[in-house]
């Protein structure tokens, strides 16, 4: 999950104009390639293309076979030219393309996915982002059997606000962090530690500590608009007695359930992994890196980041973006050293704005309404919170 490194960054949604890029092959591209276990579409695309997100432009699916867009270990891919344009096809050698029906038994094989999904299981099966309305109204665990603070399999937990019948199943999840939306122009000047988000307290209690936090947030121009609340799955239970509180028998779980955990409907729809790397039609305005996983304030290749835009904004699985460090202002100490009385009353004259700096590429692999998760695919520098997303560009 996105741990203590979660930070919140901001924006409002506008879209920039659509863009397109020309397909260029790598100088060292092969003419044939046999897919092996562990391959990803991104990795295969990088063997042939300078820009892997242009995979849809080169992939030539055979419409005469079932699931023509899927690739399996053992498939032979060949580079051919159709109307003078490079295309990648299955089972063909360079030359004239001949499409013909072909039946194969693929029931025991897994199709190649865009990214290594097995390594992202916690983000696919355990984490989710719920809306502020859901966060306020969700039923919650008030106590665990035998007055214990924690409970796990074969224990009964007591849930308030659960309108359900005996036999219904629910997921139990733990509140982690809040994703907030902030102004475009960051009001802080004390480094990333100043913008780290606080853990989400799902109790709803108003304490002096919370009042102080709200006051300091207001003074820092922090917007109160919440993009979503992240929760982490801790178990599944079945209602054995309705009421308030209802009794829920824990059936299985990853962690012990405790008072304060939320009760959510199970996610029934299976994760759709049939997407491929592609460039977005546009980039939502001020789309930023909200948080990074397993790091303090920065992240590198094959690490997960949370992004400040989601399905509502047109973000979809497989979209690839470039990540840039945002513009920043520094003092021109060459022309205006510290203590220069010429800028005592006009300090802005001593400032110079450094341009955005390219950091790497990120591919979206899971979307929620206003937030999405992405995997950093490559980079030349660590990605930090508050980094801004742009259309994908060649490295």
Predicted features along the sequence, with ranges:
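Short, linear, compositionally biased motifs with a strong N-terminal bias
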Residues: 11-12
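Surface-exposed, polar/charged interaction patches used for macromolecular assembly or partner binding
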Residues: 2-6, 20-395
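N-terminal signal peptide c-region/cleavage motif recognized by signal peptidases
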Residues: 15-18
């Amino acid at each position: 999950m996105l741990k203590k490194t979660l930070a919140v960054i901001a924006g409002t949604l506008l879209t920039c104009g659509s863009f397109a890029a020309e397909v260029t092959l790598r100088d060292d591209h092969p003419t044939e390639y046999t897919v092996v276990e562990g391959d990803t579409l991104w990795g295969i695309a990088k063997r042939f293309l300078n820009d892997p997100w242009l995979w849809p432009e080169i992939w030539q699916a055979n419409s005469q076979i079932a699931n023509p867009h899927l690739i399996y270990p053992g498939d032979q891919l060949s580079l051919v030219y159709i109307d003078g344009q490079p295309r990648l096809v299955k089972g063909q050698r360079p030359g004239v393309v001949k499409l013909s029906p072909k039946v194969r038994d693929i029931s025991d094989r897994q199709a190649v996915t865009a990214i290594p999904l097995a390594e992202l299981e916690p983000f696919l099966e355990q984490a989710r982002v719920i809306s502020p309305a859901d966060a306020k109204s969700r039923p919650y665990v008030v106590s665990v059997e035998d007055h214990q603070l924690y409970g796990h399999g074969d224990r009964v937990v007591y849930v308030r606000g659960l309108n359900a019948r005996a036999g219904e199943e629910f997921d139990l999840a733990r509140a982690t962090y809040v994703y907030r939306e902030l102004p475009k122009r960051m009001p802080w000047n004390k480094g990333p530690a100043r913008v780290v988000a606080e853990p989400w307290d799902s109790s709803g209690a108003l304490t002096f500590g919370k009042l102080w936090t709200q006051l300091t947030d207001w003074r820092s121009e922090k917007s109160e608009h919440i993009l979503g609340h992240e929760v982490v799955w801790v178990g599944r239970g079945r209602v054995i007695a309705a009421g308030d509180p209802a009794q829920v028998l824990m059936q299985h779980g990853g962690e012990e359930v405790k008072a304060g955990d939320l009760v959510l409907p199970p996610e029934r729809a299976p994760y759709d992994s049939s997407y491929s790397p592609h460039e977005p039609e546009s980039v939502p305005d001020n789309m930023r890196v909200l948080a990074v996983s397993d790091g303090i304030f920065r992240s590198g290749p094959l690490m997960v980041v949370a992004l400040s835009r989601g399905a509502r904004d047109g973000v979809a699985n497989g979209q690839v973006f470039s990540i840039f460090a945002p513009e920043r202002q520094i003092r021109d100490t060459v022309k205006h050293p510290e203590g220069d009385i010429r800028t005592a009353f006009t300090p802005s004259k001593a400032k110079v704005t450094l341009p955005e700096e390219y950091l790497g590429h990120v591919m979206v692999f899971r979307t929620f309404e206003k937030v999405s998760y992405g995997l950093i695919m490559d980079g030349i520098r660590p990605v930090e919170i508050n980094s801004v997303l742009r259309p994908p560009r060649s490295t």
